[in-house]
Amino acid sequence: MPLKGQIIRLDAPAPPLKVSLWWDDNYATTKSDGLLWAGTTEEDVGFDDGITDAARDLIITSAVEMLPYLEEAELVQQTACLRPITPDRAPIIDAGVGPDGLTIVTGAGRQGIMLGPAMGIAAAALATGTEPPVDVSAFSLARFS
């Protein structure tokens, strides 16, 4: 099942953040659109990709606690997305489990954006029949058999 994550985009009254901030399960960062993006939720709600007032309020409260000046920010947009996640919350990185040449790389959830480059390097090695730079056997699809 997927894991839903909601984020908000704010027009902040102060200069943009020059670095991304992470605290607890939350983050805030200024994106190239000039807006401050803050989030996120982790909701096990099946394929429901709708936004909720409760998530908005939770994200805003957390962001304002970390960055009090955001109390004056304007909410520009709230979005939700569905992230692929495995039952054990570890990604799948595997080859040779289907048609020749098929390599499976999925299930990293909200960490996918950070793990993607490393997962891609491992997947490329598996797809070309070479040894990945690190042992990825723990991420085999067979662990769910």
Language-model features: locations:
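Active-site substrate-recognition segment that forms the wall
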Residues: 1-101
